[in-house]
Swiss-Prot record:
Segments of this protein annotated with the region Disordered: 233-261
Coiled-coil segments on the chain, per record: none
One Gene Ontology biological process: cell swimming
Pfam families to which the protein is assigned, alphabetical: HVO_2248
Name of the protein in question: Uncharacterized motility-related protein HVO_2248
Biased composition (Basic and acidic residues): 251-261
Phenotype reported upon loss of the gene: Cells having transposon insertions in this gene are hypermotile.
Function: May be involved in swimming motility.
Length: 271
């Protein structure tokens, strides 16, 4: 399996400049989408709680969030392709199949693989964007070089510092790191509310209130320094001219390029 995953990860075209467009044909579909977004908001709050708890290591909070995202991608793979999703993704990757199911499975499987790698690989930024339109939503799984954006909150883990410090400065660094984690926890907790505001329930809002919404987020790590960011994104109302009746891959929208220009540091590269 490890050999297959290395081969799969070598195909940078799987994610690059692409997104998954999923139809929202009725209120039941909207409710499911809303539920998924509320799960993301809840995960933000759980991460904030863990960061604010001095008895929980920063790495544990970081890995818990990564594992949660990876599990969601695995569920998507199974929903699209069944239990043989890995075989289907690999078949698409090597050119043995060229169909919609194969393309979607390969997309989410690549995202799954990269999320699993981020537990041990640093200096790689997770930079997704989720957009709601009147009849559909899009998910663009992005990764970029580096570990932060121009608007990220930074916080440190003294357990991951390789510096040799004397006792006095080590205690000061430890306390400053805990303070940075508490500051980050407050920021991350606020981002959960942004998600809830951008994607309201179909049972508690009018169609006009919920037909457009969007967020982009970013998370990264470099050594002992971790970063988080989440902000609203204004969807382009002219992005799609034709409806869609099943999930499919589409080119990324103008919103993706705009957020890259606004948020990625100079020299950063979308992977």
């Amino acid at each position: 399996m490890s050999e297959q995953r290395v081969t799969f990860n070598g195909d940078t075209r799987v994610l690059y400049r692409q997104a998954v467009r999923t139809p929202l044909p009725n209120e039941d579909a909207e409710r499911l989408f809303h539920e998924n977004m509320m799960n993301i908001a809840d995960a933000q709050e759980r991460k904030a709680d863990m960061l604010a708890d001095p008895d929980i290591s920063l790495l544990e909070a970081y890995e818990t969030q990564l594992e949660g995202i990876a599990k969601s991608y695995k569920r998507r793979c199974r929903h699209i392709a069944g239990d043989d999703y890995e075989e289907i993704a690999m078949a698409y990757n090597r050119g043995a199949r060229d169909d919609r199911v194969g393309a979607l499975t390969a997309y989410y499987f690549e995202g799954l693989w990269r999320m699993q790698q981020r537990i041990t690989v640093t200096d790689m930024l997770f930079f997704p964007i989720i957009l709601r339109y009147p009849d559909c939503f899009t998910v663009n799984i992005r990764f970029a070089s580096g570990h932060t954006t121009t608007e990220s909150v930074l916080y440190e883990s003294p357990e991951h510092s390789t510096e040799e410090l004397d006792d006095e400065y080590a205690e000061r660094y430890y306390n400053e790191s805990l303070y940075s984690q508490k500051e980050a926890a407050e920021y991350i907790r606020d981002t959960a509310e942004i998600i809830r505001e951008e994607f309201p329930s179909p049972d508690e809002s009018t169609f006009e209130e919920r037909q457009y919404g969007g967020i982009t987020s970013a998370g990264g790590r470099k050594g002992p320094v971790f970063s988080s960011m989440l902000k609203r994104v204004e969807p382009d109302p002219n992005r799609f001219s034709e409806p869609v009746d099943q999930p499919t891959l589409v080119e990324e929208g103008k919103e993706a390029r705009r957020t890259e220009r606004e948020l990625l540091p100079e020299g950063a590269i979308v992977l």
